[in-house]
């Protein structure tokens, strides 16, 4: 049955991912099964090379599993073609990177509008107003017409979160989103992620910052491609 029915938004069933090496196959993920519910804030932790980023890439459809099944929002992601994946990802997954990756020659509002232009999800005459509303949500509306270089690191990360929300995706994936921010700014970013989950978004974050564990419904620890343990925090 190629569907998951209930409030589970992300479901991995016996997922493995291998990469060829000179000495044989290297398994970044090994027989991973995982269910994540709608509206939850989830942390993924583990040492470098443990499989954290591969897990995020599998959920986002950036990588396909070698074995197993991947469902996101009732779609069997691992069966989509490359062209189908590009369209699906643009509408269903918002990605926030550690280093923001805003285009430096575009203004903040132009950066936020880019995913809307790519997916053509909203009428062109509505996109600027939607982008302004998202910048208002992340408290940097007054920075809309500035270039990224004029903003602080925390403001740029807020802009990146607004961009990730551009097409109203149900899932936000963030890879070390506060790794280069001071503690106060990082706290404000986690506060924002928490607000997003209360509005129904599912947020999955790779993080090493244990001081923010109280924000998460669950902490998933990965070691050598295997889920080592899952700590329910609420």
Predicted features along the sequence, with ranges:
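ABC family nucleotide-binding domain
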Residues: 9-10, 15-222
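H-loop (His-switch) and adjacent beta-strand-loop-beta switch element
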Residues: 219-232
């Amino acid at each position: 049955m190629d569907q998951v029915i209930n409030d589970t938004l992300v479901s991995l069933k016996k997922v493995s991912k291998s990469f060829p090496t000179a000495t044989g196959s290297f398994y970044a993920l090994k027989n991973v099964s995982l269910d994540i519910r709608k509206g939850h804030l989830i942390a993924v932790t583990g040492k470098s090379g443990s499989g954290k980023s591969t897990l995020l890439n599998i959920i986002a459809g950036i990588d396909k599993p070698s074995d197993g099944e991947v469902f996101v929002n009732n779609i069997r992601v691992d069966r989509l073609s490359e062209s189908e994946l590009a369209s699906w990802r643009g509408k269903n997954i918002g990605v926030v990177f550690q280093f923001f990756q805003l285009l430096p020659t575009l203004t903040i509002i132009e950066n936020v509008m880019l995913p809307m232009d790519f997916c053509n999800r909203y009428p062109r005459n509505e996109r600027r107003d939607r982008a302004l509303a998202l910048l208002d949500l992340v408290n940097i509306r007054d920075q809309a017409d500035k270039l990224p270089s004029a903003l602080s690191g925390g403001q740029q990360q807020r802009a990146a979160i607004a961009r990730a929300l551009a097409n109203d995706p149900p899932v936000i994936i963030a890879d070390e989103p506060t790794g280069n921010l001071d503690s106060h700014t990082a706290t404000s970013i986690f506060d924002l992620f928490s607000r997003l989950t209360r509005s129904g978004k599912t947020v999955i974050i790779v993080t090493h910052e244990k001081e923010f564990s109280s924000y998460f419904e669950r902490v998933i620890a990965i070691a050598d491609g295997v889920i080592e343990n899952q700590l329910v925090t609420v």
